[in-house]
Amino acid sequence: VRSSAASDVYKRQLLAPFTGAGQWMSGDNYGRVTSGTAVALLGRVRVLYASPLFNRSNDLSRWTQAYNDIKRSIDVLTAAGYGLANESNPGVNASGWANLFTEVPSQEAVFVTLHNTLTEGVPDYRKNNTWENGIRPYNARGGGGKTPSAMLVDMFPMSDGKIPATCETYNTLTKSDIPYYREFPFVDRDPRFYRTFAFPGVRWSFVGNPTTQGNRYPHNGPDYELWNYTWYTDAAYVDDIEANSSVTYGADGLLNDVKGFYVRKRSDDRDVNAIARYVYDEKSGGFTRSAAPYMEIRYAEVLLNYAEAACNAGEMGVAVDQLQKIRARVGYKAENNYGLEAGLDGDQAKCMAAIMYERQIELAYEGKRFDDMRRWMLFDGGI
């Protein structure tokens, strides 16, 4: 199966056409598979094959092959114009990073699925992205929102780039000296925290005006702020995270649809993306007609795959370089080593822990964590 998969990807690379710029970046061809897509996919396959799930004896030649193939793929991708989107413009609280998820075209989009805002017709060409509607709170005419796990909220880096001292995972990494208070989880965090989660007081602007639909919708879209404080009809349920919705009451019309934290990752935020990718329907549809793209492989994942292969092939310096690039894009500076602890290039175990940690943060809510857990056999406590 492995040889067949690699062979298919090589053929795809040879057959995939290049434009004058080296990739499909505009017009009707944007989103089509390129040779850059093919080599990036091959890199993912190589890392999977070298991982413990398929490599119980830790055959180092597999990691070396993955390292060499991904190194070559980066040359192809760079020549084709791919790279870290908005790399020189971190913005406020990683707004440049947040913009890459709705930007079209985007140099980050190595393997991208496009959507549209069409409604039902004959023939039916609808291909709406339902993510935006799913993550938006009910009082914005969204689907009600998605709730992040407390574990992920608690483990996001502090503003110095280090893991919180209270976190019980990644124990090989040096913990942050900045105090973390679970009662105030939004204080002094990694810039990406503020674009991955929404919490009380967050401005989460959108194009639309649901206020015409009654008191449950108190905010005009451009001025929307999330005030999701919760009251309980019975004090006995205050600390019960499984409390039934019948005993909770949310502010600002959220009522029993309230959540303590919301997933915000990949949101089409009006303050980040001036041109909304959705057609807002204040009466019934909310954000359901969204044309936001979905990136199955983005350039940051390629760099993280490269870092993982490099670390396990003994090239820890190369691995650390990739982590630094990803951290720099969201605003970390060289003077504090981009929030990374010193000496990662001399300690393979720490280097690998830093890579897996960065994958969990950078790629949160992009459908990658399950496969990372599986290929590293972490469901059973690791190897």
Ranges and model annotations:
Residues 1-144, 160-383:
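Acidic/polar-rich alpha-helix caps and helix-coil junctions
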